[in-house]
Design a protein with these regions (language model features):
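Short alpha-helix boundary/capping motifs
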Residues: 65, 122-123, 148-150, 320, ...
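Sequence-level detector for tyrosine residue identity
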Residues: 8, 48, 75, 144, ...
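A short, flexible N-terminal coil/short beta segment enriched in small residues
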Residues: 36-43, 136-149, 238-241
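Helix-turn-helix
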Residues: 30
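Zn2+-dependent cytidine deaminase-like catalytic core
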Residues: 33, 38-136, 221, 252-254, ...
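Proteins enriched for Cys/Gly/acidic motifs involved in redox and nucleic-acid/cofactor modification
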Residues: 22-23, 49-50, 118, 132-160
Length: 375
């Protein structure tokens, strides 16, 4: 019995995920080449600036099967590009290879592509089918879709908490809530994102490095939201800013009286970004998110503290949550909550999340949630 378009597209979507942490700010894309109801090639976008999924899939076809590419069907999880970037247009490669049919899961919202690849292939005589397994494919490219459509990054909130929901004691002590294996998992997550961000409270309390250890191939930018320019010059973040990209986001109004401190931060290697004067804290945060996205940040992991996570929640900008629950019962009415901010007054206005993954890490529980699309 012949396999369906949905079956082959599921293979393409699965292949796309092999690029996670390597291709951003490009989207993860997979491609499967099928001839005579048999998969003859499979590929994915492997690294930023490298060949795209379609070319990798055709290259993977064994020599004795190369003649089957002409007349084959290509299943692509995202519309093939039609413009010259770091690589040539993928639709041109499919046309040149004499692919007969192209099945697409998601039409690319990028104005440089958006239907143009489809039109170009149709003019060349290729049959094009769209909207196959779209929901599943959109989950994989959700960060790219958000940045392309809204100019904002995909925000991943990460925190560790006790079983009664505290991220620190009333005194601010938080080391350690989760176990060593969970903390190693955090470094794996850092290697997958474009930037890691904390608020100044966390930076002052923990004096963190925020870089993935061991380092991955990608360079992760460290971001500190520091409205009043309080980050010490002898902090680990500042002292290592020549080694790891470090952006300090300050309030443009406060910056007027902190010229010497800002100059010292910049001399140490930090990049200092100033918001437009006169903005409130949430407006400044949204402005910062737009700045990061416009500079190639697709995936932004925010590691606290409660104030910045609360502000992001109030702005409806938390897209994904990675939660490590340590097997500790803390108590105390003044213990610190992971998400502060204003929050809604009614439970039915709370941000609805969908559980994606649950994993036991020794005596910790690791959970992943994604925001439910309210559209």
């Amino acid at each position: 019995m012949p396999k369906t378009d949905q079956h082959y597209m599921s293979l393409a979507v699965q292949a796309a995920q092999n690029g996670q942490g390597h291709v951003e700010p490009n989207p993860m894309v997979g491609c499967v080449i099928v001839a005579d109801d048999q998969v003859i090639g499979i590929g994915w976008h492997e690294n930023y600036g490298g060949p795209h999924a379609e070319l990798n899939a055709m290259t993977s076809v064994k020599a004795e099967l190369k003649d089957k590419i002409a007349g084959a069907t290509a299943y692509v999880s995202l519309e093939p590009c039609s413009h010259q970037g770091k690589t040539g247009p993928c639709c041109d490669a499919l046309i040149a290879a004499k692919i007969a049919r192209v099945v697409i899961a998601v039409v690319d919202p990028n104005p440089k592509v958006s239907g143009q690849g489809i039109a170009k292939m149709q003019v060349a005589g290729i049959e094009v089918v769209t909207d196959v397994l779209t929901d599943k494919a959109e989950q994989v490219v959700a960060p790219y879709l958000k940045r392309t459509r809204t100019g904002l990054p995909w925000v991943i909130a990460k925190w560790a908490m006790t079983i009664d929901g505290s991220i620190a004691s009333a005194s601010g002590d938080s080391q350690w809530i989760s176990n060593e294996k969970s903390r190693k998992r955090v470094h794996d997550l850092r290697r997958r994102v474009d930037a890691v961000m904390v608020g100044i409270g966390t930076a002052l309390a923990d004096d963190p490095m925020l870089n993935p250890r061991p380092a991955g191939k990608r360079i992760v930018t460290r971001v500190v939201v520091d409205s009043a320019v309080r980050l010490p010059l002898d902090s680990k973040l500042v002292k290592t800013s020549n080694e790891f990209p470090t952006l300090i986001a300050v309030d443009g109004e406060q910056a007027k009286t902190q010229a010497d401190k800002i100059a010292a931060l910049e001399a140490s290697g930090c990049q200092v970004w100033q918001s437009n004067p006169g903005r409130d804290s949430n407006q400044r945060l949204l402005e910062l998110l737009k700045h990061l996205a416009s500079n190639g940040v697709t995936n932004l992991m925010v590691e606290g503290g409660g104030q910045i996570l609360g502000a992001l929640n109030d702005l409806s900008q938390i897209d994904e949550v990675h939660l490590f629950t340590g097997a500790k019962l803390l108590g105390g009415e003044n213990a610190r909550s992971p998400v502060a901010g204003t929050g809604p007054s009614l439970m039915n206005a709370a941000t609805q999340m969908q559980l994606q993954q649950v994993e036991r890490i020794d005596n910790d529980v690791y959970s992943v949630y994604r925001r439910v699309n309210e559209a």
